[in-house]
């Protein structure tokens, strides 16, 4: 929506094909709008946007900014949109505009009140953080499961002697348990990094509006509570503009991928040396040399 989050309660416009659109400008139709639209890629934050919309509407009603009857109609429309799915949304510049258009289609002009006291700036930032929290927790859970498996295997091989390598050459004797525990330690640090990123992601930007807040008597702590955030992002400009949490999450995942790459490469080397026998489920063969077992996976 426009940066002015407080002036969108007018009746929606109709385009040349009588399709409800939230706003009209030089990008309202044609190839420019199609090129600029992120609606398809926004499917990843469809559920997040609906959650943010619901929390915002509930807060607006609790604060007396919109009526309970209007809030109920909007929430019912959001439920219907949720059931219909992302693929049923009308065309839009992004999922946020498309959902608002769909609400207005169902509710009428009052549906636009859903966006009262809110900018697309803080809305988008909140949706991204909401979805990223799920992704980070899922990634952290996989690291915990991997670390547990490594430690269980290490405990079974505390006295299983193996050659330790440097420069791909046998260097010193060690044990399989010692080797596996080294990766368990690295994975543990990966988990900690992901959880640190989660902590900095888990703050609500909602209510920051375009970048300087809103004169409406909103309750930012209430929407943060409804969305499961630990706290709000204090500075409204930082709330709308910050994206460092994305870089931090990406870095944590990249470091974990490096840990996994090292473990996978070790297994490839051990397979070549005949120390381990990879399952056929994780191997391929050659089109001309069927005796080969290639560790491609």
Question: Predicted segment positions?
Answer:
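Internal glycine-rich alpha/beta core junctions
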Residues: 98-101, 105-109, 113, 175-297
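A helix-coil-helix interface module used to build multimeric assemblies
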Residues: 2-4, 10-182, 188-191
